[in-house]
């Protein structure tokens, strides 16, 4: 019960939320958030067919909340980067600029220090356009309606976390001891 209350303090869960569950039921983190917290707040739960089908399930279900492990996010990141590498030089440049400007926005929004950049003065002008073009596609990998992705089980690669946060993916790294749950 205490863990459900703590989750509720971190993520607002409502009856309109859809939780996508794909981690094993034996995973305490998954069970606490996906099952107990979702049920406590009347949220809907969808069960992924398997981790191998997670991309299709994200698109089909369009969840608002999910728990994951770093490997799943790293796989989605790698796939996105491979697709980007196939694009034109202009598309690659736009994506890089979107990541840089998005990271500065994330830092500003969260009170973190901002790395100096000559492009910083243009952020307010170009970020809405870049976000619509690039960020929306990245958020679309997660179904396009995600309000919280909780990643635990191991530490997430900093480059992956930074990229998704820069693209407006609502990602949170979480930590907890299974034996205290």
Label for each model-derived stretch:
Residues 2-18, 25-135, 145:
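Conserved AMP-binding/adenylation subdomain of ANL enzymes
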Residues 71, 115-116, 147, 152-160, ...:
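Conserved A3 ("GATE") glycine/threonine-rich loop of ANL adenylate-forming enzymes
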Residues 23, 127, 149, 153:
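Glycine- and other small-residue-rich loops at beta-strand/loop junctions that grip anionic moieties
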Residues 23-27, 176-179:
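AMP-binding (ANL) adenylation modules
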Residues 8, 18-20, 40, 151, ...:
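Residue-level signal for pocket-adjacent positions within structured domains
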Residues 138:
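Phosphate/pyrophosphate-binding loop motifs in nucleotide- or prenyl diphosphate-using proteins
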